[in-house]
């Protein structure tokens, strides 16, 4: 009888330990694409997409270079011409990408934590009987351990 009660409680313990890990990893993979898609569509309302932004910046750089070349040909510029500040554009784009990735990961972790909490809460409320069996099994184990230490 004790073995029959101990086996479901051990399975329940394994269920409580392994389920959140499995759910978290699977939801991270599944929800990541959905959240990125949602985030990019929301961002596209106010900002350009990365591809459009890169194309526009490349065109501006080409236009600046062409205008500098045109002015050099006309002889209006000195011989020491500095390059346009393209590094600033690249740094801003990199910073925006890092910031967006950070927001995406925060949303992803928050959503998976809520899902895991809901699953654990549901399994706790549905499995109170299993927890009682598990609790009595742990108490019996400690009593036996205490008796063996005294002996």
UniProtKB/Swiss-Prot annotation:
Any one GO biological process: proton transmembrane transport
Domain of life: Eukaryota
Molecular function, one GO term: antiporter activity
Pfam families to which the protein is assigned, alphabetical: CemA
InterPro entries, sorted: CemA
Segments passing through the bilayer: 7-27, 107-127
UniProt KW keywords: Antiport, Chloroplast, Hydrogen ion transport, Ion transport, Membrane, Plastid, Plastid inner membrane, Potassium, Potassium transport, Transmembrane, Transmembrane helix, Transport
Catalytic activity from the UniProt record: K(+)(in) + H(+)(out) = K(+)(out) + H(+)(in)
Subcellular location per the Swiss-Prot or TrEMBL entry: Plastid, Chloroplast inner membrane
UniProt main location, coarse: plastid
Membrane topology category: Multi-pass membrane protein
Gene Ontology terms: cellular component: chloroplast inner membrane
Keyword Ion transport: yes
UniProt family annotation: Belongs to the CemA family.
Physiological role: Contributes to K(+)/H(+) antiport activity by supporting proton efflux to control proton extrusion and homeostasis in chloroplasts in a light-dependent manner to modulate photosynthesis. Prevents excessive induction of non-photochemical quenching (NPQ) under continuous-light conditions. Indirectly promotes efficient inorganic carbon uptake into chloroplasts.
Name recorded for this polypeptide: Potassium/proton antiporter CemA
Gene behind this protein: cemA
């Amino acid at each position: 009888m004790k073995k029959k009660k101990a086996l479901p409680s051990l399975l329940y313990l394994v269920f409580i330990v392994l389920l959140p890990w499995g759910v978290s990893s699977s939801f991270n993979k599944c929800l990541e694409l959905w959240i990125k898609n949602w985030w990019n569509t929301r961002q596209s309302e106010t900002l350009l997409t990365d591809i459009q932004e890169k194309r526009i910046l490349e065109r501006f750089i080409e236009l600046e270079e062409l205008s500098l070349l045109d002015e050099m040909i006309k002889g209006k510029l000195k011989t020491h011409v500095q390059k346009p500040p393209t590094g600033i554009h690249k740094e801003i784009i990199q910073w925006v990408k890092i910031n967006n990735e950070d927001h995406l990961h925060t949303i992803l972790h928050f959503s998976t934590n809520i899902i895991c909490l809901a699953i654990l809460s549901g399994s706790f409320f549905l499995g109170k009987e299993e927890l009682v069996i598990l609790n009595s099994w742990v108490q019996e184990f400690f009593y036996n351990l205490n008796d063996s230490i005294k002996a």
